[in-house]
Amino acid sequence: MNTDLEKLVFKWITTETNKVDVSGDFYCQTRDVFEARNDKMPEELIKKGLDDSLAYLVYAMAGELGNNAFDHNVGNWPNIMGAFYAFDYDGKDGIIIIADRGVGVLNSLRKAVPDLKDDLDALEMAFTKKISSRVLENRGNGLKFVRGNVSKNNLLLEFFSGNAKADLNHEMKISVSDQIVAGCLVILKFQNI
């Protein structure tokens, strides 16, 4: 399902900086644009038949993931500021995609853990430890919240950053990705039950 959206986001995140489409419906240059679009999502999903509780759960998860794009890149965007945000639901299968062309998980977490080895270790740490690059703030639980809800609700999550990919469902598998992602790319899939 939604292979067109997945192809579109991979193109958006890997295209040369001067060729990135920042005029499209899926581009959110600022947090307020992202939040306004995300706030509309639950009602749109419910109108298409998604269970209310699942609609609001994936809304909360998308909010966490999308806000991370802005929180961890503020003042540090290497090229294109903002995030790609898209969602779709066909009455049975749903997808939410969030991507940013920011510093990525490894470079973000190295602010708190300078000796972090590679993208694989960074993803492992991000999903399992209470850690944040914003070391003076009490943060670092967002991806644990996402991971817990993916597992509890039989959702599927793919998270790409650098040369690493985390696949989450009831278990988490971290591997080297065929696709290099400068920044982060998240694909969340869900089904109405």
Pin down the residues of each PLM region.
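Bergerat-fold GHKL ATPase/HATPase_c domain
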Residues: 1-63, 67, 71-85
